[in-house]
Design a protein with these regions (language model features):
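Pocket-edge structural micro-motifs
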Residues: 16, 118-120, 170
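Catalytic core of non-heme Fe(II) oxygenases with the double-stranded beta-helix
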Residues: 125-183
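Active-site cores enriched in adjacent His and Asp/Glu residues with nearby glycine-rich loops
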Residues: 103-121
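N-terminal accessory scaffold of Fe(II)-dependent oxygenases
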Residues: 81-90, 113-119, 126
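N-terminal auxiliary "cap/dimerization" subdomain that precedes the catalytic jelly-roll/cupin core
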Residues: 1-107
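Non-catalytic surface loops within mature trypsin-like serine protease
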Residues: 18, 120, 157-159
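Residues forming well-ordered secondary-structure scaffolds
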Residues: 85, 89, 110-111, 148, ...
Length: 183
C-alpha cells in the first residue's frame, strides 16, 4: 500500500509504474503539444527543434527566450489529452489506491489540469528554489476542499539517471517550515 508511505515516512512512493506503451503515449501527447506550440512561437526554428526532439531541446533552446515562452498555461495538456490519460491503467491503479478522484484545476482553466515541465540541464532558473507545495496553497494559489486530500503525482518523462532535477526531502510534509511570501 502506498498511502502509509505518502502520509507518513518518507512522504512519497515510487511503487507505482506506468506500462511502457502508456509511457510512450504520454511522451507523444507532451511532444505534440511542445511541437505545436513551437510552430506558433518560432516557426523559423521548428526544423532545428524537431531535429533535437524534446529530449535534446536544450541544444537549440538558445534560439528562443526559454524563460518567457514556456509559462505554465501553455504547458497544460489539452482536454483530449487529459481524457486519454484518464483512461490509462496507471490512473486506474491510482483509483485502486485512493478511490475515485478529481485532478485539480489549480489555475482555474475550467477543467482538470495535467501539465509538464521543461527543464534544461545546468539552468538554475528553470527550477524553483526548495519549497513546500503547501506554501503556495496556504498563500491562496489553489485550494483543497475540507473533505478532500491532495496527492501530487510527478512522472519523469525524459530523465538521465542521477541527474534528475526533482528533489524531495523525506518527511518534509510532517514539519512546519518557516517561510514568507515574496511578491
Amino acid at each position: 500500500m502506498i498511502q502509509p508511505k505518502i502520509n507518513g515516512s518518507p512522504g512519497f512512493s515510487t511503487d507505482l509504474s506506468i506500462e511502457s506503451v502508456e509511457f510512450a503515449r504520454l511522451r507523444d501527447l507532451i511532444y505534440d503539444q511542445w511541437q505545436g506550440y513551437l510552430k506558433t512561437i518560432a516557426p523559423e526554428h521548428v526544423k532545428r527543434f524537431e531535429e533535437c526532439g524534446i529530449e535534446r531541446y536544450h541544444e537549440a533552446s538558445y534560439l528562443i527566450d526559454h524563460g518567457s515562452v514556456w509559462p505554465k498555461k501553455v504547458r497544460i495538456l489539452p482536454q483530449n489529452a487529459v481524457s486519454e490519460i484518464r483512461k490509462m491503467s496507471f490512473v486506474n491503479k491510482l483509483e485502486d489506491y485512493f478511490g475515485s478522484f478529481e485532478i485539480s484545476d489549480e489555475d482555474n482553466v475550467g477543467r482538470e489540469e495535467i501539465y509538464w515541465r521543461l527543464v534544461r540541464p545546468n539552468e538554475k532558473n528553470d527550477v524553483n528554489p526548495l519549497h513546500a507545495d503547501a506554501w503556495f496553497w496556504d498563500l491562496g494559489h489553489g485550494t483543497t476542499p475540507n473533505n478532500m486530500v491532495r496527492v501530487k503525482v510527478w512522472i519523469g518523462i525524459y530523465v538521465e539517471p542521477g541527474l534528475n532535477g526533482f528533489v524531495y526531502v523525506p518527511e518534509s510534509h510532517l514539519k512546519n517550515w518557516p517561510y514568507h511570501a515574496v511578491l
